[in-house]
Amino acid sequence: MREIKVRAHKSSDNLKKENQLAWKIAEIASDKSRPGEDCIEMVINRIIDNASVAIASFNRKPAVSAREMALAHPRRNGSTIFGLNSKIKVHCEWAAWANGTAVRELDFHDTFLAADYSHPGDNIPPILAVAQQKGCNGMDLIKGILTGYEVQVNLVKGLCSVSYTHLTLP
């Protein structure tokens, strides 16, 4: 695995795009190697987990509210919302909002426990929504989700190594 050193910079540093974190993440995401079968299976299970939790929260107020907001932004060839007819499409950012809210509402999806915790499954709704709208294939979706997991888990480990916790902030 490639190691990327991350540190804060002043806005005035005006880093070259190749030195910015977003660029480094894009390099990871665009890697041409095929993930191992165990990784592919894990991602498929995480997608099922996310969709299941979203359906379980389908009638809860936050999920209903986010879904209503998303439905106000229809888009031909857009993205789907968990639990609705797959012919109904909305702009990807709104599908990500509705699906992400539904997944997070019950907070039953995967958790990465280190010195702190995070939910790398939170990456799935936006990546899925963009992949749908862009017409990506299944392997592109899997690689996008793997990238989201890899980056989030490693950032959490890095933050935990310096005794930072979001739970203690005011």
Segments from the language model and where they lie:
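N-terminal core-entry segment
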Residues: R2-L167
